[in-house]
Amino acid sequence: KPYVDTTFTDPYGTAVGVINPTEKFKVVIEAHADEISWFVNYITNEGVIYLKRNGGVDHQIAPAKRVLIHGKKGVVKAVFGWPAIHTRMSNGDQKEQNPKVENLFLDCGARTKKEVEALGIHVGSVVTYEEGFDELAHDYYIGRAFDNRIGGYMIAEVARLLKENNKKLPYALYVVNAVQEEIGLRGAEMIARRIKPDIAI
């Protein structure tokens, strides 16, 4: 807010900061605010949690990953499981299975469906991978949802640097952090129809 002239959000939740809102020529710089995730789809009587994908999450990397289930009572830790290796390889005629959405599940430590529900977990709860940030060799960094977080940081930095360096633009600049990118660019599409930019990056 301190770096733009005005702000607004749309009904989807996309956040917009505008510099020079009265100028007719409109430029959008956009990042996205959402991240890949999973949804709780089914809870068995034994407390095993099955999921559906939300966005472009890769199920092949899921086995043994730690996750956070965002439930009604807060965050619950869990871990991805899938059939143990000795059960996957017990049939000599059959090739070892690959991870599939259908054979992946979450274990949150609960022993029954009631125990899962008592933790605040319900069908529709969002599941994200555990937080984590690290530095690799040669100044490379890794972390959860880095694509959108770095993108959001970059567009905010543009606004900050323009303000702090007292740069005047001959056009309206819309700094847009859109939602629903991971499920089909919906937020960007809706806000573009509202702003009607001449240029979008």
Language-model-derived ranges and their functions:
Residues K1-I201:
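N-terminal hydrophobic/helix-forming segments and targeting peptides
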